[in-house]
Amino acid sequence: MNGKPGRAGDWLAQAGNDFEWATSSFREGHFAQTCFVCQQVAEKALKALALLRGYEAARGHSVTEIAKALDINDEILNAGRRLDQYYITARYPDAVPSGAPFELFTPDQAKEALGFADCVLIRVRQGFADERKRDSGSQ
């Protein structure tokens, strides 16, 4: 425990802003960047949820590992598994056999990544709303 729930909203706000960035990147045809930023959206949103629940900010960048630590549903866990694939490969040429990542990522991959990131954001925002209801009901 010992997290800082007051900062949870900051993490969630940044995740939301990053989602806007990912959407803009998609519209501009930057598909590798869209995929990477979507991984960041999910990571930051889940870190927000961890803080909200009173946990220390999760260290590391694996959406899958953060989701496991939060004992979150399979839908989010599966989204994390897919998004984690983009953390390195969407940015570094030495993470792919040949070519630059921006040349290799497709609109379909980026669209899928946006869907996964949106799913995580929706679930985390719902978690925040549920927490507010609990707090107002216990007063």
Can you annotate each of these PLM segments?
Residues M1-Q139:
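Terminal alpha-helical segments
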